[in-house]
Amino acid sequence: MIKQSTLKKSINIKGFGLHSGKPVKLTLNPAPVNSGIIYRRIDISPPVEFISNVNLIKNTNLCTSLENKNGVNISTVEHLSAAICGLGIDNIIIEITSSEIPIMDGSSWPFVDIIINSSGIKTLEHDKKFIYIKKIVRVEKEDKWIEVTPSNKFTLDFSIDFDHPVISSTSQNFFFTFSVNSFINQISKARTFGFLRDIKYLQSNKLALGGNCNCAIVIGNKRILNKEGLRFSNEFIRHKILDAIGDFFVSGYNIVGAFKAFKPGHNMHYMLLKKIFRNKNTWEFSTMKNNHSYVNNF
């Protein structure tokens, strides 16, 4: 059986909040078996903890945010969540000095890099549990849709449709089969993106105050404003897959299924998760044997 994992040691990360523009400090700590993904706001006295699960998702406008029953929240969790999922980590305590996870360079790579090189991953003596999708689950909203079907792998077949010359000149669809190595090499470095006109509007409304070319792909009327250009020719759709991996893992579980979407986004991901977990006959818990294709991908 494949085993649960955590960090080998604690690590510190510094950055800035995308929307607040303020400095943020993270400490990622090892956690015992069956702890799950725990976020701990240490800027509040006493500290407030969130165990990541679908019921805590409260806001999916521009990012994914968690909020407890007392209204305490943590926002922009998706890129860190994707890094934790992508590295196969099951148990971790994330201490944070703000209400917002730092945006870093707009991808999961800074988190992946520091976890691998400054901590490493420790195997724990307890079987890892997965959620298997048993029946097709689909949600639609206007011309957008997303579905998941039963599979013995975690795959994402996503398409976007942006009517902008910069994005439409790139491939807007991508099929990805999850594995730790493929996540690191194909997905983790894909950055979030935004249009200059939207960033200016958001900043005028005191949002995206930390947004710039150091933490996102910024798109002008006819070109990308980042001097270094794109990291992948299809970086936009790859980042959409990164967001989905992070959002699905906010449920607290690795979900085994074939995901397919047209015009995905945080809200569509959340709608799908709600429908999955609302209908218990659509999924089941299971451990996996080492010869299972999904485990081999890990």
UniProtKB/Swiss-Prot annotation:
Q: Might you name a Gene Ontology BP term for this protein?
A: lipid A biosynthetic process
Q: Where does Zn(2+) bind?
A: H79, H239, D243
Which cofactor names does the annotation list? Zn(2+)
Q: Which UniProt keywords apply?
A: Hydrolase, Lipid A biosynthesis, Lipid biosynthesis, Lipid metabolism, Metal-binding, Zinc
Q: Name one Pfam family in it.
A: LpxC
Q: Could you tell me the EC number(s) of this protein?
A: 3.5.1.108
- Identify which residues the record assigns to the active site: H266
A single MF term (Gene Ontology):
UDP-3-O-acyl-N-acetylglucosamine deacetylase activity
Which EC class does it fall in?
hydrolase
InterPro entries on file:
Ribosomal_Su5_D2-typ_SF (IPR020568), UDP-acyl_GlcNac_deAcase (IPR004463), UDP-acyl_GlcNac_deAcase_C (IPR011334), UDP-acyl_N-AcGlcN_deAcase_N (IPR015870)
Q: Which cellular component, as a GO term, is one annotated location?
A: membrane
> What pathway is this protein said to act in by its record?
Glycolipid biosynthesis; lipid IV(A) biosynthesis; lipid IV(A) from (3R)-3-hydroxytetradecanoyl-[acyl-carrier-protein] and UDP-N-acetyl-alpha-D-glucosamine: step 2/6
Keyword flag Lipid biosynthesis: yes
Which reactions is this enzyme annotated as catalysing?
a UDP-3-O-[(3R)-3-hydroxyacyl]-N-acetyl-alpha-D-glucosamine + H2O = a UDP-3-O-[(3R)-3-hydroxyacyl]-alpha-D-glucosamine + acetate
Note the superkingdom of the native organism. Answer: Bacteria
Q: Its function? A: Catalyzes the hydrolysis of UDP-3-O-myristoyl-N-acetylglucosamine to form UDP-3-O-myristoylglucosamine and acetate, the committed step in lipid A biosynthesis.
Recorded family membership: Belongs to the LpxC family.
Q: Which PANTHER family match?
A: UDP-3-O-ACYL-N-ACETYLGLUCOSAMINE DEACETYLASE 1, MITOCHONDRIAL-RELATED
Give the matching HAMAP family: LpxC
What's this protein's name?
UDP-3-O-acyl-N-acetylglucosamine deacetylase
